Amino acid sequence: MDVPFYFRRNAEPGEPTPIGGFYTQEDIKEMVSYAADRQIEIIPEIDMPAHSNAALAAYPQLVCPVVNCYIGVVPGLGGSNSGVIYCAGKDTVFTFLQDVLDEVMAIFPSRYIHLGGDEAQKGYWKKCPLCQERMKKEHLANEEDLQGYFMKRMSDYVRSKGREVIGWDELTNSSFLPEGVIIQGWRGFGAAALKAAEKGHQFIMTPARIMYLIRYQGPQWFEPQTYFGNNTLKDVYDYEPVQADWKPEYASLLMGVQASMWTEFCNKPEDVDYLVFPRLAALAEVAWTQPAHKDWTSFLKGLDAYNEHLTAKGIVYARSMYNIQHTVTPNDGILEVELECIRPDMEIHYTTDGSEPTATSPLYERKVPVKETLTLKSATFAQGRQMGKTLILPVRWNLATAKPVLGINPAEKLLTNGIRGSLKYSDFEWCSWADNDSVSFTIDLLKPEMLNTLTLGCITNNGMAIHKPASVKVEVSDDNSNFREAAMQSFTPEEIFREGNFIENLPLKLGGTQGRYVRVSAKGPGVCPASHVRSGQASRIFFDEVMLE
């Protein structure tokens, strides 16, 4: 895809269908042979009943008869088609999938065939007369058991061909599991797979929080755009799949670990290499090193040589391990800047006058206090040579900066830390709320101030259903009890649900009112509309800074 995830739209009737390319059977045979020569076995995954938009766009007769929407393909989450899956009530669906699997098994000699089984929304199955009739005929209690039937039927077919089956941990949602199926645990740090282990099934750990390589692998200010928060090289290295509270028999059923790289979040092959390397080396350490023998410092020394090998091979890899993660926290009227690097063998040097840091600049040894507008720059060094990118932190002071925020959300302290967020909503500079319908926080200015304008920094990321609020209200008080409204602004759905990824300021005129306490209340925009790439899902609000003048 040449369109970033946050710009992707739902497919509409009449639009030209994008052709993303395909592999011939000869291409696949060549790849299988190439991998086998290097002692690698390629395991194909044919997703069912969900994550199947491409097949269903080509063969719409395989969906439930109650589906009345246009079936298009939006890579990733499926857009408005995310709930369109194979119909479990049509025998033609199973015949089609058996034919597909016959072709797949003919060109992939792997011992295992992966059948997917994850993230299947059952809304259409609940309405479909064919699916409901299937449930009655097979004496199935609910739609989860209908998926269990679906997966068992296809699993039995694969096993009849002498292969073994792998499936995602949603298969454990059913009251029964296909015989011999191997479960991949991705939800709840992989814990969902333990439900299968309880029944004696083997499993593979691939927890999304640790082993999904689409996450940022370093301080996000330096990283190309991806999704879902941080997952650093050290996060991967520190992961231990065998947990102390496991039953003894679980460990013997654990087959190994897997890192997952979902390429629909990438725009070119180099993006994939960048996200995979060098975290792949950390994954290998997790798989083959006993916990007592793991040593982060020793691993880094070996990794330096490994990275030289990648360079010689022309492989684009991330040097994120050398970059600095910052934390700026209000504390008693000042800001404290904390700088960290995951490599303990790096020195951090910094400046506060806007100049570029060098190996002779002040050495970072403790939190740096900031009391005014300035630009702090820092970088990592080893043996006098700069190793990472320069972190540039523009601190901008206003009446709210370093003032306490009176609320129940710990992240609200970010709203007065003088630092603006980036286009990455998970960069640790954006504040979000669990309940977007009733966002409210109060800033204590510590003394009465004349207030002319309050500006809220707000981010839109259409692909992640992040939008500005439906309304914002500002109230002012002298005693934190009796508040008077100072400003109110509302936005239309057209203004709210815009496409793209961008930051905007929401200014509210306060007209010179005076007060010590400033309360900001925001109402969430609600559910994403039908035309949205995440239609039907709840939208979210993210603010980075409150600026009071």
Please provide the spans of the model-predicted regions.
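Active-site neighborhood of glycoside hydrolase catalytic domains
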Residues: 77, 81-180, 187-195
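Short, compositionally stereotyped local motifs that mark structural "simplifiers"
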Residues: 290, 294, 300-440, 459, ...
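Flexible, acidic glycine-rich loops studded with aromatic residues
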Residues: 164-170, 175-181, 186-336
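Short, solvent-exposed turn/loop segments enriched in Gly/Ser/Thr/Pro and often Arg
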Residues: 46-54, 116-121, 169-171, 209
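Aromatic- and acidic-residue-enriched carbohydrate-binding clefts of CAZyme catalytic domains
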Residues: 1-37, 54-95, 123-143
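Aromatic, loop-rich ligand-recognition surfaces of beta-strand-rich domains
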Residues: 424-487, 502-549
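Solvent-exposed serine/threonine-rich low-complexity stretches and specific carbohydrate-binding patches
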Residues: 485-496
